Amino acid sequence: MIHKNWAELIKPQQLDVKPGNDPARQATVTAEPLERGFGLTMGNALRRVLMSSLQGAAITSVQIDNVLHEFSSVAGVREDVTDIILNLKGVSIRMEVEGPKRLSISAKGPGVVTAGDISESAGIEILNRDHVICHLDDGADVYMELTVNQGKGYVSAEKNKPEDAPIGLIPIDAIYSPVKKVSYDVQPTREGQVLDYDKLTMKVETDGSLTPDDAVAFAARILQDQLGIFVNFEEPESASRADEDDGLEFNPLLLKKVDDLELSVRSANCLKNDNIVYIGDLIQKTEAEMLRTPNFGRKSLNEIKEVLSGMGLHLGMDVEDWPPDNIEDLAKKFEDSF
């Protein structure tokens, strides 16, 4: 069928991940080659999912001794409660247990209270332990209880407030996303002798709770899962499906020689120079591999794709146990059926 071209579109042949200055948090991810226009499509989709849909952990509420609401101040603490809340939002957390969980901070002045002063709990790790929460003057004594939970995206303080919240519990806006920054760039790239492909480069920075390349992988998996509902047909039969009538483990058409396809002289010579003898050899090549063949261009590629399509085949197919040991004998056996 003419519409069944998804397997013939060129796919990225390599994913290059270059760590940044902080490998646990920064990386540049490059994918190429992509069909023209796919760089922008994929880059934009991945960026949106990275920023909005990955699971992370955040502080969702705080309760400070002798404080009734967020517009208060704490004796001996330089920052007011509003500033303390803002600083708590900046605490990066890796959480490997089901939430919500309660943590606490107990400190006396003089000194600086940092994220490293948050109490430890199994399955919860504070990543930016030097992050400043507040400054205490001499004689100051502060105790606060924190609620930590998992989620995705942004959740307002109003939604984080429990119905049975005790007096003094202050809900906090939660920014769960472990991804802090994402930018992408699309540049033209060459594949063989063809120049009109895309190269997608993404710069990703996380809070350290997961690596940038894992973040991209999770985002891609989310997109894959969400798009599956739109596929309203079954996959075509594989070329390696057994043919019950002849006992072969593959389509006998794969035994036909490419010399019999009546290709143009240029295309035929390119296949010959690349030691492609049978259709079974040809269909296992990807578009990218074909375009790397010397003197093989887009015109030859389109010609071969059209011929294969007429046979119900396409480039990039997977054929198990190819080539068979007795391929020449099998080719002669089925020669009259082609």
From Swiss-Prot:
Region (Alpha C-terminal domain (alpha-CTD)): 250-338
Biological process annotations from GO: DNA-templated transcription
Keywords for this protein: DNA-directed RNA polymerase, Nucleotidyltransferase, Transcription, Transferase
KW Nucleotidyltransferase (keyword) present: yes
Pfam families the record matches: RNA_pol_A_bac, RNA_pol_A_CTD, RNA_pol_L
GO cellular component: cytoplasm; DNA-directed RNA polymerase complex
Region (Alpha N-terminal domain (alpha-NTD)): 1-234
Signal peptide as annotated in the record: none
Biological role: DNA-dependent RNA polymerase catalyzes the transcription of DNA into RNA using the four ribonucleoside triphosphates as substrates.
Family: Belongs to the RNA polymerase alpha chain family.
Identification of the protein by name: DNA-directed RNA polymerase subunit alpha
Gene that produces this protein: rpoA
